Amino acid sequence: MEGTLLPLFAVLLSSWSVVGDPEGPPNVDGAPPSKIAVVGAGIGGSATAHFLRQHFGPEVQVDVFEKGEVGGRLATVTVNHNDYESGGSIIHSLNLHMQEFVKQLGLKYRRSVAGKTAVFNGKEVILEETDWYLLDLFRLWWRYGISFIRLQMWVEEIMEKFMRIYKYQAHGYAFSSVEELLDSLGGSGFINMTRRPLSDSLLELGVSQRFIDEVIAPVMRVNYGQNVSIPAFIGAVSLAGAQNNLWAVEGGNKLVCSGLLKIANANLRQAQVNAISPIQSGEALQYQLSFTTAAGTGSELYDIVVLATPLQASVGSGVQFQGFTPPFDQLPGNYHSTVATIVHGYLNTSFFGFSDPRLFPFASILTTETPDLFFNSVASVCPVNISAGFRRKQPQEAGVYKVFSPQPLDKSQLKTLFRSYYSVQVTEWQPYSHYGSSQGLPPVELHPNLYYLNGIEWAGSAMEMSSVAAKNIALLAYHRWNRQTDMVDQRDLMHRIKTEL
């Protein structure tokens, strides 16, 4: 989403309780691990490999298993010889890990192409962005009073506290659970935000119900495909999509993943991991990974394993845990299904109340929660490579559009949104947790030296959140391996860091 509908929030984070004893057994002789496995080569897995290399040094072997494409949900589709983002497409200016990755890899920021946003309620456009910032602010005030100011103050307070994570990680501190991390940043207030509906929190702030219905709900729908009953902390992350200061990587965001694997000198294993089993040899504990490649089946032993792929049954990771005592329970919760449809065609602007497409000024249309609406958003999208002379197609021209919807669009629905079209490409994702389908947050530590990254997605899903979780797990794995307990789950870190300086 582009524009100034809200001056809002982005950012990050991670996971729940420990299964087993996180600190035992120790590495026996003080030697570094010889082999580490990362399962999953999306942004979380790629960043984990990078950070593991930073902390464990050049000698350790880092293998990254990926059954599909590197980049995971940072995927692209091709239309008329141009690639377009079909997955994760925006990054916030305060996403410091992602910014550092781009700098280290020598990648470039994609040139921004201006475009206005509007909100549609199924009958008419009820809120629209103009070329005049002051006019937009006046309209917000006229329609919603000071709700947007109250929201901005709330968001700024959250951001100020949450940005502490970068300082903590720069000083090497790690957390064994999301509760510990949240508590260190914002105390019980942050933890409670993961349990309380966004709508309740906003109403308590004095934000009007109308503002929630017409501004907040559309942002939730486009970013997570869900409504304002999602937890408040997740809602704050989602509101990042309403900011101006967003960016993307020239050539596609997935280039970050392949680049991180390269500079980490990681071995990419194109394989499906089928099973993980603990192997005890004296006091030493290793994990046997059984996997399938195009050439057949195999297995290898690893000292440390990081799972950077969702483990919930609804996603179908294919990973089984064998021989663990006690046995692993199935991780609770489901992932939310959403459909990204990339259409090359002519937008039916009359559906939105503009009979003449030349008078349709919007690049993005968000929607309110209306029973008859079959889509969450539709937007004119730009290719991942933007030339100096590129301009966004006008509505009377054939353009490339991305439609988010809860279900695949049938022909009649496509005909409703488009006067005609040349091509349709459909990607069905399970990109986000279905918030409210699980009580509590998944663990970071499944077993000694066995870590789970994707529990972060139950606190909020974004590229930077996965990157923060990756850094946390790399630090946690390093400190656990080396018995540096004073670097894990420490209290009053801001004061402690000040005294270290």
Model-inferred region functions:
Residues R53-V79:
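Glycine-rich FAD pyrophosphate-binding loop
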Residues F175-G189, A217-A264:
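Helix-loop-beta segment of a Rossmann-like dinucleotide-binding subdomain
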Residues S299-I304, T309-D486:
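C-terminal segments that line or cap access tunnels to active or ligand-binding sites in enzymes
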